Every structure is written in structure tokens, then in C-alpha cells.
UniProtKB/Swiss-Prot annotation:
GO molecular-function term, one example from the UniProt record: homoserine kinase activity
EC number: 2.7.1.39
Protein name stated in the entry: Homoserine kinase
Keywords: Amino-acid biosynthesis, ATP-binding, Kinase, Nucleotide-binding, Threonine biosynthesis, Transferase
Length: 332
């Protein structure tokens, strides 16, 4: 989350007239990320996040905001969009769609342990099942068609070895996506970007027997209807890796995957294609980071991510991928 669109005090005062959130006490930009303009907003009624959507259109936005409301109604801890005085969940600010959502409690855990991965795995499975009856449809906009469209623009900037990997993996993924097994994979609304910095943890209540409590998932603006296994792969590729090498941490990966399976067991097709999907998850973020690194947009506050991180992860997943762990327990 970065700041591409500035909001002055007078802009904010005019905007807040459409909400019943009391008086503004504090307002500041959030510098991390690369997609939308985000601001922390504190009022006499509580703490919120204001987002100006730089790419998503007014036609696309209801999928994301309504999904968050749907998940919140199913007791999945996510930010809840705040209705305006006309009942709408978003309006226009500087001609761009914008919304206010509740701010979750807690802080990101950037050095997660096994206990954090257990919490994330269970909640991710709960989120997938909670989304089964969500009515709106929106594909993952950063999936295969987006890769095919944008890889040619990246190629002039990279080495021959990187180009060979980028193009060979694109061909591999295109064949996988066209297969009958891929079509049979369970699907539904997915977060598609569940990195460490998009999950909050709070201290667990005394006497619960737990050291950590998951505060919630946020930043759903890359969400889309996709294969659930893709969502799991994206999550594992961030939560369960050695950041220097991209190698999977077996203890954390097993903890997350076993916890997920206690809520939703994996199918036979998912087990067969775990390696392919881990590669897909790594490829998606390698492509997007290459694009953002070499073809950036101007922004007031912008911190581009290192594309090499996901190149290392992709090469590692091609070389080594353990099977999904077995489990014999399921609950809801």
C-alpha cells in the first residue's frame, strides 16, 4: 500500500461529510506496498483505513467490498467496509473509487513461527469454506491471462537466463491451466496475496493456552475467484520460507498445511499438483515484481519489492517440492 493520490485536509473534510464517524483526530499515509493509496484514519468513533483505488474500477470494486462484508458475517476476521450516508460502500475521491474500512487489532508478524502458521492455516481454510456461497464472481486478475499479457513487456529488461525461465515456466503453467486435473481443483473466492504483512496477530487472552491470537486478514484488493490450492501455495511461499534462499521451512510448512487440512482436507487432484501450484504462486509474484520494478508508476511514497526473491523461490520449487502432508482429521 502506497500513496499515489494526495488527500488534503479540505479534501478529507469534504469526504467525511458522507460518513457518520465523528470528528477526525489523525490522518496519515501508509507507505508500504505498490497498488493503492492508503491512509490510517482515526476519529472520535474509532480507527479506520481509507483506501483510494488506483487501478480497480467502480464496476470491479463491489466484488471486493461485498466479499469482505460476507466473510465478516461468517465470523472470519477481516476489515468491514463502512457504509456512506447513502448506503453505498464506496464513493469517488479525486475521481477515483475510495472506501473506508474498519482497522483490525494487532500487528504483523514478520518472523513467524510454527504457532503463527497454524493460526493462518486454519483461518485460511475457514475463509475458503465461508466463501462458498458468495454470489459475486470476479476472476483473479493477476492469473495466467495477465502473465501472458505482461511478460513480453518485461523481457527486454532481464538477462537471457531469466528470459528462458520466464518463458519456459509460462508454457508449463499454460499447459497446467488447460488440463482436466486443473479444471477439477476446488475453487472459490481467494485472498491471492496473503503475505505476512497482510495478517495481524494480537496477544492471546490469559488462560486460553495459546501464545498468539490471529487478529485478522486484510488487503483483499487482489482477491478473486481462483483455485483454493493457489491461495494455499501463495501463503506457504511467503510464510514458510527462508527469506535468503527461498527454501521451504519444513516445520512451518507442515504446521500450516496440517492446520488447513483439519478444516478442509485436500483432494487427490490437489495432492498431485501441489508442486505445479507452488510454482504458479511463485511465478505470479515474480512477474508482478519484475513489472513493478522495471515499469514503475510515479508515487509520493513507493518501496518496490525485490524481484529476485521470487525468482529464487521459483527455481527452488522447480528443483524441490515435498508432498502435501497426510492428515486423517477433519472438522468444521
Amino acid at each position: 500500500m502506497a500513496v499515489f493520490t494526495a488527500v488534503s485536509d479540505s479534501d478529507l473534510a469534504q469526504w467525511m461529510r458522507h460518513y457518520e464517524l465523528g470528528d477526525v483526530l489523525a490522518f496519515r499515509g501508509i507507505p508500504s506496498g505498490i497498488e493503492n493509496s492508503n491512509f490510517f484514519l482515526t476519529t472520535t468513533r474509532g480507527e479506520y483505513v481509507l483506501t483510494i483505488f488506483e487501478k480497480l474500477t467502480a464496476e470491479q470494486l463491489p466484488f471486493y467490498l461485498d466479499l469482505m462484508r460476507h466473510l465478516a458475517s461468517h465470523r472470519v476476521p477481516v476489515p468491514d467496509p463502512v457504509p456512506r450516508d447513502d448506503g453505498a460502500l464506496f464513493g469517488l475521491l479525486h475521481g477515483k473509487p475510495a472506501a473506508i474500512v474498519t482497522k483490525l487489532d494487532g500487528a504483523a508478524e514478520l518472523a513467524p513461527g510454527v504457532e503463527h502458521c497454524i493460526e493462518v492455516g486454519q483461518m485460511l481454510a475457514r475463509m475458503h469454506l465461508a466463501g462458498r456461497d458468495y454470489a459475486r464472481q470476479q476472476p483473479n486478475l493477476r492469473s495466467l491471462p495477465w502473465w501472458q499479457e505482461n511478460v513480453p513487456a518485461i523481457v527486454p529488461f532481464i538477462s537471457d537466463a531469466q528470459r528462458a525461465l520466464l518463458e519456459s515456466e509460462l508454457a508449463h503453467q499454460a499447459a497446467f491451466f488447460a488440463s482436466d486435473d486443473y479444471a477439477a481443483l476446488p475453487s472459490g473466492p481467494c485472498h491471492c496475496d496473503l503475505f505476512r504483512d497482510n495478517v495481524l496477530f494480537a496477544h492471546a487472552a490469559p488462560g486460553t493456552g495459546h501464545d498468539v491470537r490471529l487478529g485478522g486478514f486484510f488487503d483483499f484488493y487482489f482477491a478473486g475467484c481462483d483455485k483454493w490450492l493457489f491461495d494455499v501455495a501463495v501463503t506457504v511461499n511467503d510464510w514458510c520460507v527462508d527469506l535468503a534462499t527461498g527454501v521451504l521451512d519444513t516445520a512451518r510448512a507442515d504446521a500450516l498445511l496440517r492446520a488447513y487440512q483439519t478444516v478442509r482436507p485436500f483432494t487427490a487432484e490437489e495432492r498431485r499438483h501441489w508442486s505445479d501450484m507452488l510454482r504458479a504462486g511463485a511465478y505470479r509474484f515474480w512477474v508482478s515484481r519484475l513489472y513493478d520494478f522495471y515499469l514503475p508508476r510515479a508515487a509520493e511514497m513507493l518501496k518496490p519489492h525485490d524481484p529476485g526473491h521470487f525468482e529464487r523461490i521459483l527455481r527452488e520449487r522447480i528443483a524441490h517440492t515435498p508432498a502435501l502432508p497426510e492428515t486423517h482429521t477433519a472438522c468444521n
